[in-house]
Amino acid sequence: MLARDALNALYTFGGVFAGTALGWPVFLAGVFGVVSAISATLVSWIGGRADRHWGPKPVIVACALALTAVCVLITGLGRQQIFGLPVAPGSHLPDALFFLCGVLIGGAGGAMQAASRTMMVRHTTPARATEAFGLYALSGKATAFLAPWLIARATQATGNQSLGVFPLIVMFLLALVLLSWVQSKGEAQQ
């Protein structure tokens, strides 16, 4: 739930961040979305092959770590500076880095969602699949407010939209901690 909420917040607030913190026009935010979608297609395919070879848990871990790295990069990204280091006026470095973030958000997000569903299949039986996937869908809705609320509180507390992403780092890391107790092969097959 935590990783899904954080990922959904990245999807939702990516364009908002680009428009407000980086000053992107709507057109460029649209290009960002297309780039993210294309990377989601390619990396999800690669993630599916990795899932088949190593199982879903390592894919989920790798994707959550990549998304955590994206959040860390966003916390230090701005039009005039990157992690406190000044950026030359007119530099496209912040834009290029945020496009890289979009590639990683789309790619790692798509692969993580697919691997999460594979993990669900491993943790249910055919007789309980509808119930398990129904609870999985409900859990995503039950806490959907959490990440946006935390982003709003962090942004308000720091006065910095980039630092407002910090709670997502915590959410991804907590998800990884909780994932350590999940059995890779699934309970249904043991």
Residue ranges and their predicted role:
Residues 12-29:
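Short amphipathic helix-loop junctions that connect adjacent transmembrane helices
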Residues 26-27, 126-136:
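Loop-to-transmembrane helix entry/capping segments in MFS-fold secondary transporters
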Residues 42-56, 82-83, 155:
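Helix-to-loop junctions at the C-terminal end of transmembrane segments
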Residues 52-66:
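Cytoplasmic membrane-interface "Motif A"-like loop-to-helix N-cap segments
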Residues 65-91:
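C-terminal ends and interior cores of transmembrane alpha-helices
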Residues 77, 165-190:
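Multi-pass alpha-helical transporter architecture, strongest
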Residues 90-93, 153-172:
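A membrane-interface helix-boundary motif in multi-pass transporters
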Residues 111-124:
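Intracellular juxtamembrane helix-capping segments at the cytosolic ends
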